[in-house]
Structures are given as C-alpha cells and as structure tokens.
Swiss-Prot record:
L-aspartate binds at K84, R166, R229. GO terms for biological process: 'de novo' pyrimidine nucleobase biosynthetic process; 'de novo' UMP biosynthetic process; amino acid metabolic process. InterPro entries: Asp/Orn_carbamoyltranf_P-bd, Asp/Orn_carbamoylTrfase, Asp/Orn_carbamoylTrfase_sf, Asp_carbamoyltransf, Asp_carbamoyltransf_Asp/Orn-bd. Belongs to the aspartate/ornithine carbamoyltransferase superfamily. ATCase family. It is an enzyme of class 2 (transferase). It comes from the Bacteria. This is Aspartate carbamoyltransferase catalytic subunit. Keywords: Pyrimidine biosynthesis, Transferase. It catalyses: carbamoyl phosphate + L-aspartate = N-carbamoyl-L-aspartate + phosphate + H(+). Carbamoyl phosphate binds at R55, T56, R105, H133, Q136, L268, P269. Its EC number is 2.1.3.2. It comes from Alkaliphilus oremlandii (strain OhILAs). Heterododecamer (2C3:3R2) of six catalytic PyrB chains organized as two trimers (C3), and six regulatory PyrI chains organized as three dimers (R2).
Length: 331
C-alpha cells in the first residue's frame, strides 16, 4: 500500500499509478457504498479550515462519516487558539494526537506543507492560497473519467481567473501528465496563468498551449470546459474586481456551437460566470463534480490510512460512443 502514511500537499506527489488507484477506488465506492461503510470505523478526521469552505470541508466530513469514521475540528479560525497567537506547528502537534488524519485549508501558500513537517499523521492540503488544491484536482479527474471516458487526447479549456485559481494550477499540471493533451487558457489580460507554471508544463510535458481572451472563438473545439469565478477575495482593490468580475458568462447561446459531448466543469462556488439556464444542459456536470468529490476523498483517506487494499475493480462507464469497459491496473 504505497500511499499509507503519506501526506498529500501537491498533486505532483502522486505517481501516475497512484492517481489511477484513487480514481478507480472512488468510482467503485460510488457504485458500491455499502461495501465501504465501515472501512474507517474507529478513525478520526481532524479538519483545520483557516479560510471559508463549503464543498471541500463538508465533502471531507461526509466522506469520513460514510466510511464509519468521525470528525472533529474547526471551520472558523476565530474559535481556534491561533487567534491567541498559537503557531501552526503547535496547532498541528496537538491535533495530530487527537486525529488519525488531518485536512488543512489556509490562505497562505505553503502552510499545509509546513504543517506536514510537524505531523505524525497524514496531512491533506485542502487548498492553500492561490497555490494548490490537490483533492479538487482528483475530483476533477474522477468526473472527467466518469463522464468522458479515458483521459487522453483531450482539448481542455480553462476560463476565468487563471492567475489566482489554485484549482486551475493543480489541474493543469496534473492533466499535462496524461497523453496527447492540449490546453486553451482563456482569461482577461490582467489574470493570466502564471508564467512559471506555463513554462514548466510546456518544458516538462511538451503540451500545446493556446492563450486567448475569447471563449466564443474556441467553443467549437473544446472537449472539457473548466469555468472559474473571478475571486473577489484575492483582490486588494475593489474597483479592479468590479472591472473584471463579469469578464466571462457562459450562456446557452454560447453553447450552440459546442460539441455535443462537451463536459462543463466548475470547482464552485459560482457567481455569474455560468448562467443558471446552463444548469439544465446535460453537458453541465459541475453539480455531479461536487458529488464525485465525496467519493474521491473517501478513496484518498482510506488509502492514506492504509485501511483498504486496491483490487483494481473493472467498471462499466458510459461514454460518447456507447458503453465500454474501462480497467485500470493499480501498482
């Protein structure tokens, strides 16, 4: 069980086979939840959310409860001893005596990595500033696998705040590891993908990247559209946010020329960037995406705790050309 006892701070820590193991197991957990209802019985998840969260925090809690475990922690930093001046190191040293596995969200990039250095139990990064969000990446991957089939040779468009969007940064890096991927990066000029990240994936994985400020221009060629909100909390100047907040709004009319097997994703929460009329389009999978986040986090925690062995289940998935059997072999 190679994942047992490990921390997950950055998706780069996962091998390609480990990513497949987690996706595999998460899909099987969705199909056969009763089989896993006691897999974490007696285990405690400790949650440390120094920044607001709905989906990530609650999906972690739901994931542990569905496996028979329990949860303790805080979601409001004002109720923790950090407000009294306690250091991250001391907080971690205490909490890892109370819990078997920890998840941390923090507004400062790098803090979960720092926390992992003081913890004797696995630490999962639940999002750190504008840096990384590895479990959202796993959520995105399992959703693509479930609704589009094999992750290979896809044209993926990221649209919105690409500068501060940690979900974009994590997913772009990870998808670049899959075969024959192409990316379209759509953003206002003020919010481009970080140059060092773009350079890294091009040099390391030889992927093709197109940068543009037009969503409409590329709609017909996209396989996966990953919409993101313009993040108000990352702006120091309210006027700058107001200027950019409605840069992109996905509507039914924009989707008229899109592929019929397009998948529309969004890490949520959304503001105005996807009109509610799109929710009824069968290509909109962002609510299903949030649901799949529970199962992939179940899989991750079970593997990090060493409470489960991978049997590499064979799963039947519906894809665009009918029904196929997809099999992954875990290492």
């Amino acid at each position: 069980m190679p994942l047992k006892g490990k921390h997950l701070i950055d998706p780069d820590q996962l091998t390609f086979n480990e990513i497949h193991e987690i996706i595999n197991l998460g899909l099987d957990m969705e199909q056969n939840p009763a089989k896993y209802s006691k897999v974490c019985e007696g285990k405690i998840l400790g949650t440390m959310f120094f920044e607001p969260s709905t989906r990530t925090r609650l999906s972690f809690e739901s994931a542990m409860l569905r496996m028979g475990g329990t949860v303790l922690g805080f979601s409001d930093v004002t109720t923790s001893s950090v407000t009294k001046g306690e250091s991250v190191a001391d907080t971690i040293r205490v909490l890892d005596d109370y819990a078997d596995i920890l998840v941390m969200r923090h507004p400062v990039a790098g803090t979960p990595r720092e926390a992992s250095q003081y913890s004797t139990v696995p630490v999962i990064n639940g999002g750190d500033g504008g840096h990384q969000h590895p479990t959202q990446t796993l959520t995105d991957l399992i959703t693509i696998q479930k609704y589009h089939g094999e992750i290979r040779g896809l044209k993926v468009a990221f649209c919105g705040d690409l500068l501060f969007g940690r979900t974009v940064h994590s997913l772009l890096k990870t998808l670049s590891r899959f075969p024959d991927m192409e990316f379209i990066l759509i953003s206002p000029p003020e919010l481009p993908i970080p140059e060092d990240l773009k350079t890294e994936v091009i040099e390391k994985y030889n992927v093709k990247i197109t940068e543009t400020d037009s969503l409409e221009k590329h709609m017909a060629e996209i396989d996966i559209l990953y919409m993101t909100r313009i993040q108000k909390e990352r702006f120091l100047n309210q006027e700058d946010y107001e200027k950019l907040k409605d840069s992109y709004i996905l509507t039914n009319s924009l989707l008229e020329n899109a592929k019929q097997d397009l998948i529309i994703l969004h890490p949520l929460p959304r503001v105005n960037e996807i009109h509610t009329e799109v929710d009824r389009d069968p290509r909109a999978k962002y609510f299903e995406q949030a649901k799949m986040g529970v199962y992939v986090r179940m899989a991750l925690m079970a593997l990090l705790l060493g409470n489960i062995e991978i049997a590499a289940p064979t799963l039947t998935l519906k894809v665009k050309n009918g029904t196929i059997m997809t099999k992954f072999i875990a290492s």
